């Protein structure tokens, strides 16, 4: 299941975070990082959240 979340995070980082933790602090941080043109930071944050919440 983590592979699916990581693939979702690569395509759309907030989706990967949402699938892992739902709508919370990490989701909103990731959404802001992704929206403001910092896709790579959003991606790194999403992978970190997915790996951390195992």
Curated annotation (Swiss-Prot):
Membrane topology value: Multi-pass membrane protein
Compartment annotation: Cell membrane
Which InterPro entries does UniProt cross-reference here? PMP3
Taken from the record, one Pfam family name reads Pmp3
Q: Which residues cross the membrane?
A: 3-23, 31-51
- One cellular-component annotation, GO: plasma membrane
Keyword annotations from UniProtKB, A to Z: Cell membrane, Membrane, Transmembrane, Transmembrane helix
Which superkingdom?
Bacteria
Q: Does the keyword Transmembrane apply?
A: yes
Could you say which protein family the record assigns here? Belongs to the UPF0057 (PMP3) family.
Q: Which PANTHER family match?
A: HYDROPHOBIC PROTEIN RCI2 LOW TEMPERATURE AND SALT RESPONSIVE PROTEIN LTI6 -RELATED, UPF0057 MEMBRANE PROTEIN ZK632.10-RELATED
This one is known as UPF0057 membrane protein ssr1169
Taxonomic source organism = Synechocystis sp. (strain ATCC 27184 / PCC 6803 / Kazusa)
